[in-house]
Amino acid sequence: DKLKILCVPANEGGCAYYRIIAPMKKLEELYGDRVEIRWNKNPLGINEKDGSWQQDWDFADMKWADIVFTQNLSNFGGNYTARIVGKAKEFGKFVHYDTDDLLTNIYEGHRLYNVYKEKGLEEITKFIYHHSDLVTVTQRKFAERVAPYCNPNSTLAVVKNSIDYNLPCWNMNKVPKPKKKYTRFGWVGGIHHEQDLKYFSGVPHFVNQRVGRENCRWDFFGHPPPNTPPDDWQHDVWRKYRDIILRGFKGGKNWDIHYAQTPDRYGQMFTMMDVALAPLEMNPFNDSKSEIKVAEAGRYKIPLVATNCG
């Protein structure tokens, strides 16, 4: 019989893509004769409109699986993720839980700091670690920080981030520069980097003064796409980003803000850069991040200027 794996991504964002969606699709592609995979972001049957539980839900996918694999905290909430683990154990399943952020130590200044404290999400994550059979994280220091919360009879392993360079977006031609002595700086970021950008906001003005704004350009990628509802909280994030970013610019415009790409098109953003930027505040949360930016920028042979953490 094939090994049956139920994959429960937290959402469809970049973290879920790199940590569960892409690797498990690759596993199925390479070993489809040995594994069978089902996908279900809502295996507990919560009503997605009002958050109520369906009383007659049969948990068919969970009962079918040998392994229940989930990651981070579901868009349905931390308690929902914990219940996935609890139900899987109730049905006698092997539970694999993956995280790519240090959710047990959110730093002050992180956009979700108050939410994590008010909803007890750090403690919920510790509970999930303790009740999972296999916990995977992205790097060694991360593993050392969460080891105290894991069950000593379970397995804690480092599974590094990787990129499928066979995807078309990682095999595109670079966008030509307008002239030879011209440098395009690029920043690609999600929606939790307000504190990190503060460490960078003065840099563009300094560089523009030294080399001349006509000889360089600054591109910021990740703005919510045009079809995002106007009341979506991501717009508020990028309004704050914009305020922070533009503090570093005086005079003529040599910057632009670009829409986010879906994870399977990330590579396209790096075709427009000559130097990639990844400023981070030094703290345990950021020091637990992976080297994924090296893999992204490196594919297009772009130097990466980053904080020495992680």
PLM ranges: what are they?
Residues T70-E90, T104, L197-F200:
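An aromatic- and histidine-rich active-site surface loop
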Residues K141, S162:
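Carbohydrate-associated surface elements
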Residues H192-Q195, A260-R299, V305-G310:
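Nucleotide-sugar-dependent
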Residues D1-N75:
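N-terminal pre-catalytic "stem/leader" segment of glycosyltransferase-like enzymes
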Residues W53-W57, K63, R83-F91, V115-V135:
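Membrane-proximal helix-turn-helix segments that form the acceptor-binding/catalytic region
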Residues V68-F69, H96, H130-R140:
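A short beta-strand/loop micro-motif in the catalytic core of glycosyltransferases
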Residues H96-T125, N166-W170, K181:
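Acceptor-binding helix/loop patch of EC 2.4 sugar-transfer enzymes
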Residues N11-K26, W39, D164-Y266, T271:
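Conserved catalytic-core segment of nucleotide-activated headgroup transferases in glycan assembly
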